[in-house]
Amino acid sequence: MGLFSFTQEIAMDLGTANTIIITNGKIVVDEPSVVALDRRTEKMIAVGEKAKLMHEKTHENIRTIRPLRDGVIADFYACEQMMRGLIKQVNTRNHLFSPSLRMVIGVPSGSTEVELRAVRDSAEHAGGRDVYLIFGYSFS
């Protein structure tokens, strides 16, 4: 991927325990599915392992959330923030500007239309321009 690449392709496995991001055939992110948010502002403070370490050990104004339960989104906003934070960890230093994201996301085969819409919306709000869902597939 060069200096002027316009699109970055990533595959994401949103898991209840861990979320994995793959790009160029390599796992580049493998982090716990946890996000830490400021209770007052709802801004993301940490994601993944850093957020997991904050669980029940932080200031009362910080809450840690596992946004997925049983493979589906339980907290839409927290999931979006977690996805944004994890996507930022993907190496994009070689770009003059941030590329648009083409995302493939594995979802449980029994997902309802509402759950699928929540995954798609979270991915789009997290920066995905083209979002594709693959049913009953785990990338890990």
Task: Describe every region a protein language model picked out.
Residues 1-140:
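Nucleotide/phosphate-binding catalytic cleft detector across ATP-hydrolyzing
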